[in-house]
């Protein structure tokens, strides 16, 4: 550390470091003994520190929880395998790459599926240990990798999937890529382990490594970054550690970015020292200083973030401990320049434009609704095959959206009909999807996530079906409510930016939060705790009935819940998220 312990926000330095800090220090720049574990046929998983280290390489060890008890009874270890998350800044991928990835998923993954995530990338679920090097070498051949998509690094960088404003989107996307590359770890550990298969042990090799931005112990905790183009807030910019809000010069060109910091949606049930929070405004920078600003925020979090208590290690807690003005001043000191005042911006919604839209460049873009992002051939649906068949003829690119959907982008007029034919044949275009369903989201949860407390992806379709009936009952079928289900309080389903958010508490039970907004700028308030899905539907039946009867013109469900006093707004999450009586508005910048 280069900072002094007396500096505001560093009280944690008086406490022992978390064991993860030891792990990173001793990992030989993330190599550990992973190669040794790959050769061990006695277990399907990784041992000791390697269980955590593989996360820096974009993987999590998981097992099939549906059969865990059955295997234990047979005296077998859990059916272990890995989740892999690809690094894909802005979610753009070529059809030629997709074809190879589809082949791997079918031949080598337990679930034979590809999962589109709300961080604009894809995941393989159920990859056995014996296939990991094969998988990483395939990614390398395709010009892809999975480094820094998990663990204490800057994760996959999001960028608004806006196919209409093509020039501004192109410029913003280029900065998303630049930010991603700039904040990557410099270690060759990923390549040595997964591509070259080398075992590096000597102290000389160890000393030659350098991590000028992340440091040899990397960041205190995960770090999430997004680039967003108003008025569409599809990337949920207020839920990230760092946000770059693109500002147009009025002629469709990029004038610069408003920089925000300190968003995050995870918490722990009953732990009032944890809370979700929205990101706060730091200021404006011209495009040429965007990387400087990104590095300054990251290194401030690197040096001031809590390395003793991982539950209070994200950037939002660092800002709370330092104070926003002190945090901003430290970032400006590291940038070597002050921020300019924030330029005006406004969000009007978050949903994707499902169906065909025409860009200003004359190309067409088809956004396909993919429920919970799951592409798989099962239950009479062939969604995975449908995307594969489109990939075989598509001359443009694919864009994974932050709403877990897929855009078939840059389609020529002459190719529209054939692509739509394939999409309809394989069920990728449906006429029975309500606006409510289009604006719903879930995390994966059971059976693969080890942190899951309740179902999410597997119950979302039926839950939304029941909610659709309630909407129809009250005459609101043409409207929507942003609804999200997450299986635990870690926040992967971004329920803490929903109008209706369900957070798993135990098997079959959830906490019900309401009062977020359609634009994604307000955290919902806890309304009912530890209740079942039927109980939640009964509560929502009553609330939606009131909304239908008493709402103002154009008023969303979340705004209605706040205006009518059903719940108090979360105004200052560190103070009032757990105690609504303390809800008092504060300055956000």
From Swiss-Prot:
Pfam families: NIR_SIR, NIR_SIR_ferr
SUPFAM superfamilies named in the record: Nitrite and sulphite reductase 4Fe-4S domain-like, Nitrite/Sulfite reductase N-terminal domain-like
Enzyme class, first EC level, given as a word: oxidoreductase
GO cellular component, one term: sulfite reductase complex (NADPH)
EC number(s) recorded for this UniProt protein: 1.8.1.2
Catalytic reaction(s) noted: hydrogen sulfide + 3 NADP(+) + 3 H2O = sulfite + 3 NADPH + 4 H(+)
Sample GO molecular function, one term: NADP binding
Cofactors demanded by this protein: siroheme; [4Fe-4S] cluster
Pathway linked to the protein: Sulfur metabolism; hydrogen sulfide biosynthesis; hydrogen sulfide from sulfite (NADPH route): step 1/1
Domain of life of the organism encoding this protein: Bacteria
Keyword set, alphabetical order: 4Fe-4S, Amino-acid biosynthesis, Cysteine biosynthesis, Heme, Iron, Iron-sulfur, Metal-binding, NADP, Oxidoreductase
S-adenosyl-L-methionine listed as a keyword: no
Cofactor binding, per record: Binds 1 siroheme per subunit. Binds 1 [4Fe-4S] cluster per subunit.
GO biological process, one term: hydrogen sulfide biosynthetic process
Binding site for [4Fe-4S] cluster: 443, 449, 488, 492
Residues reported to bind siroheme: 492
Gene3D superfamilies: Sulfite Reductase Hemoprotein, domain 1
Family in the record: Belongs to the nitrite and sulfite reductase 4Fe-4S domain family.
Function per UniProt: Component of the sulfite reductase complex that catalyzes the 6-electron reduction of sulfite to sulfide. This is one of several activities required for the biosynthesis of L-cysteine from sulfate.
NCBIfam families referenced in this protein's UniProt entry, alphabetically: CysI, PRK13504.1
Quaternary assembly: Alpha(8)-beta(8). The alpha component is a flavoprotein, the beta component is a hemoprotein.
PANTHER family in UniProt: SULFITE REDUCTASE [NADPH] SUBUNIT BETA (PTHR11493:SF47), SULFITE REDUCTASE [NADPH] SUBUNIT BETA-RELATED (PTHR11493)
Name of the protein described by the UniProt record: Sulfite reductase [NADPH] hemoprotein beta-component
């Amino acid at each position: 550390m280069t900072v002094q312990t007396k500096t505001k926000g560093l009280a944690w330095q008086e406490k022992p470091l978390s064991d993860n800090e030891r792990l990173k220090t001793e990992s030989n720049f993330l190599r550990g003994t992973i190669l040794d574990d790959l050769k061990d046929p006695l277990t399907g998983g990784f041992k000791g520190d390697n269980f955590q280290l593989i996360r820096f390489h974009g993987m999590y060890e998981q097992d099939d929880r549906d059969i865990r008890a059955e295997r234990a009874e047979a005296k077998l270890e859990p059916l272990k395998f890995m989740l892999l998350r690809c690094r894909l800044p802005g979610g753009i991928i070529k059809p030629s790459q997709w074809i190879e990835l589809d082949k791997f998923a079918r031949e080598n993954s337990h679930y034979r599926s590809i999962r589109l995530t709300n961080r604009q990338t894809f995941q393989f679920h159920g990859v056995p240990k014996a296939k990991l090097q094969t998988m990483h070498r395939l990614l390398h051949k395709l010009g892809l990798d999975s480094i820094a998509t998990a663990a204490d690094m800057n994760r996959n960088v999001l960028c608004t999937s806006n196919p209409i404003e093509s020039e501004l989107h192109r410029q913003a996307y280029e900065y998303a890529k630049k930010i991603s590359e700039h904040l990557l770890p410099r270690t060759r550990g990923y390549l040595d382990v997964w591509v070259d298969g080398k075992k590096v042990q000597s102290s000389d090799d160890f000393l030659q490594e350098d991590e000028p931005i992340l440091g040899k112990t990397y960041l205190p905790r995960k770090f999430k970054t997004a680039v967003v183009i108003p008025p569409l807030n599809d990337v949920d910019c207020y839920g990230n550690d760092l946000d770059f809000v693109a500002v147009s010069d009025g002629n469709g060109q990029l004038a610069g970015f408003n920089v925000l910091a300190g968003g995050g949606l995870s918490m722990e049930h009953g732990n009032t020292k944890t809370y979700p929070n929205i990101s706060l405004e730091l200021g404006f920078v011209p495009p040429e200083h965007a990387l400087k600003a990104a590095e300054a925020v990251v290194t401030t979090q690197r040096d001031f973030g809590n390395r003793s208590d991982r539950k209070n290690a994200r950037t939002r807690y660092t800002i709370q401990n330092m104070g926003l003005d002190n945090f901003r001043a430290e970032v400006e000191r590291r940038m070597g320049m002050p921020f300019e005042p924030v330029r005006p911006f406004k969000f009007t919604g978050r949903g994707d434009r499902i169906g065909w839209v025409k860009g200003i460049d004359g190309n067409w873009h088809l956004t396909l609704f993919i429920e919970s992002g799951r592409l798989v051939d099962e239950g009479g649906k062939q969604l995975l095959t449908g995307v594969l068949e489109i990939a075989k003829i598509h001359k443009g690119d694919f864009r994974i959206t932050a709403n877990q959907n897929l855009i078939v982008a840059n389609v020529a007029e002459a190719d529209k009909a054939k692509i739509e034919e394939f999409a309809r044949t394989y069920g990728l275009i449906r006429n029975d999807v309500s606006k409510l369903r289009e604006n719903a989201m879930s995390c994966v949860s059971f059976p693969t996530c080890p942190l899951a407390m309740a179902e999410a992806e597997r119950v979302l379709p039926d839950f939304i079906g029941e909610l659709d009936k309630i909407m129809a009952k009250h005459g609101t079928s043409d409207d929507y409510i942003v609804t999200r289900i997450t299986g635990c309080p870690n926040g992967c389903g971004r329920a803490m930016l929903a109008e209706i958010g369900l957070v798993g508490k135990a098997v079959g039970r959830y906490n019900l939060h309401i009062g977020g907004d359609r634009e994604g700028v307000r955290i919902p308030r806890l309304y009912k705790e530890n209740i079942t899905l039927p109980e939640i539907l009964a509560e929502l039946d009553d609330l939606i009935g009131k909304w239908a009867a008493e709402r103002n013109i154009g008023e969303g469900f979340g705004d209605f819940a706040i205006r009518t006093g059903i719940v108090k707004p979360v105004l200052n999450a560190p103070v009032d998220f757990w105690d609504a009586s303390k809800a008092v508005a504060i300055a956000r910048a």
